Amino acid sequence: MFFKHDEQLEKLGNGILEGTWAKFPTLARNQIAITWIIYDPPAPVNTGGALTPDAFWNHPVRGFNYRGVERIYPASVIKLFYLLAIHEWLEKGMTQPTEELERAIRDMIIDSSNDATSLVVDVLTGTTSGPELPPGPFETWKKQRNIVNRYLQSLGWEELQTINACQKTWGDGPYGRERAFYGQLLENRNMLTTNAVARL
């Protein structure tokens, strides 16, 4: 775990949960998940690059979580993980910046555009949407589409080990090869945990 459990935050967090359940009694215990982290002074954020990544991650962080490891369908929160990946791809020269890609990245985050996210996922993975594929080409397509998952796993953060970040985001839902990739029971949908989001 990247944060240290803290008694004070535990007490406050449990109080927030109890207050929430008191106000919303029909909210089941398994319908909420929280991860809350605190960077104590001197906070290592907004340093303008003064800290190396190693120094940043060695700074102690206090935290609290309730069901922080439960996998949850993230809707548009997944776009933050695609933002991380596309910046890594650009920084490492794995893709080239273009005006359209810059516009898509901006719209993906600022407007939460699903259409923009579709282009970003295409660029990240070298795949495109379309009709169903025969088994052989579909296996290749699936392997390529999982490249963001492999990148996230390579970071070695335990909080990212159970997440799934390989699907585009949709307004009306997927069709063709995208729908087949979701799985018959939607078992391959994007999934995050609150701990993973907090770590990011």
List each model region and its residues.
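Active-site SXXK
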Residues: 72-95, 108
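Surface-exposed beta-strand edges and their flanking turn/coil or helix-capping segments
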Residues: 47-49, 81, 175
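Buried hydrophobic packing segments
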Residues: 82-86, 120, 197-200
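A generic structural signal for ordered alpha-helices
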Residues: 12, 56-64, 83-86, 98, ...
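Active-site-adjacent helix/loop patches that line small-molecule binding or acyl-intermediate pockets
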Residues: 4-38, 100-195
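Short, conserved catalytic-motif segment at the N-terminal edge
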Residues: 30, 37-71, 87, 91
